[in-house]
Amino acid sequence: MLVFGFAFLSLLLIETEAQQQNGMMGGGAAGPGINKMERGCYDTPPIQRRARRQCGGGMLVPRFFYSNRLNRCIMRRACFFMRTGMRSMIECNKECRCMQPPSEGTGGGALCEREVMRWMFVGEMCVQRMFSGCGGNGNNFKTQGECMKFCKPREPEFMMGEMPSEMAAAMAFNNRGRNNFGGSPGGWGGSPGGWEGSPGGWGGSPGGWGGGGNQGRRVNRGGGGGGGARGGGGGGGGNGGAGRMNGNNQQGGNNQMGPTAATPPSPRPTMTTGPVTRPIPSVRRPKPKPKRWNNNNNNRNNNLMIQGTTSGGWGGTTTPSYYNPYQSYIAHEYLFK
């Protein structure tokens, strides 16, 4: 309890001194009416040194402060429970530098009497103002691009990750509908909130099913059927939603082959195009006749096989010209039986 009480008293002391320092540096009167820029933008070295002694080296966290001397945001170490300073460089530039009131500078001296055009962030946009050349504050940029870089206007909520409910409903799918681009059953379904169903699947054999619409405050109609291939009939649309239940889908009719276009006639020759070249027709060649068996050659081969190779003619031992077991057996039976 003593440790927590000491930390609470130290926090009150640090906050009080921070408000006094901010009031001395031009942040306005310290009190409950100070804004975020006057409370946490300016660097206070005495407070930082005391926070380092009380928090310890391991309990310091990075914080970003705006420096009037450097005219930019810098990083300092602060105690983790101190509410002074910004948590990021972007927040420091946006809250500390860009939210300062536009200033035309201070006069005095030859160098401070010239008038130059500078860009200043006023009312969520960058505008041109006259600047004397001396004094002023951080809300002073040489070019419009530099001003927009540091002081970019805040984006809408749905650009920061929060999508409106209507947009989210339009992008959702129906429970009954299934994604299909090939023609089988299953087109895009209706979205939650009663939006009209999208068309069914494209082309294919049977038409796609239309998605059934959900119950909602707007249109309760199912999606249209998918288109057929080559001009075929499309599928039927889904039923509208009723009550809290999704509408039932209806199967589309079968696609029919559309009529094919007639072949256009060949163009006539003109002076510019010249004669129309046509392909040369192919010449039909007759098929070759099959070779017939020559009986004379067959008898001659048999005689050569049976006839012996010795000079003794038919009386000696015969040796066939080529070996054929069947023919050799017949020759042996005929000659030596």
Curated annotation (Swiss-Prot):
Found in which tissues?
Nacreous layer of shell (at protein level).
Q: What are the disulfide bonds?
A: 98-151, 112-134, 126-147
Q: Where is this region: Disordered?
A: 182-315
Q: Which SMART domains match?
A: KU
Q: What is this protein called?
A: BPTI/Kunitz domain-containing protein 2
Q: What is its main location?
A: secreted
Q: Which PROSITE patterns match?
A: BPTI_KUNITZ_2 (PS50279)
Molecular functions per Gene Ontology: serine-type endopeptidase inhibitor activity
Subcellular localization: Secreted
The family database entries (InterPro entries) matched by this protein are listed as: Kunitz_BPTI, Kunitz_BPTI_sf, TFPI/VKTCI-like
In this chain, composition skew of type Gly residues spans 183-244
Disulfide bond: present as a keyword of the record?
Answer: yes
Q: Which organism is it from?
A: Pinctada maxima (Silver-lipped pearl oyster)
Q: Which residues form the BPTI/Kunitz inhibitor domain?
A: 98-151
- Top-rank taxon of the source lineage equals Eukaryota
According to the UniProt record, one GO cellular component term is: extracellular space
Please list which residues make up the signal peptide. Answer: 1-18
Alphabetical keyword list: Disulfide bond, Protease inhibitor, Secreted, Serine protease inhibitor, Signal
Q: Low complexity: which segments have biased composition?
A: 245-261, 293-303
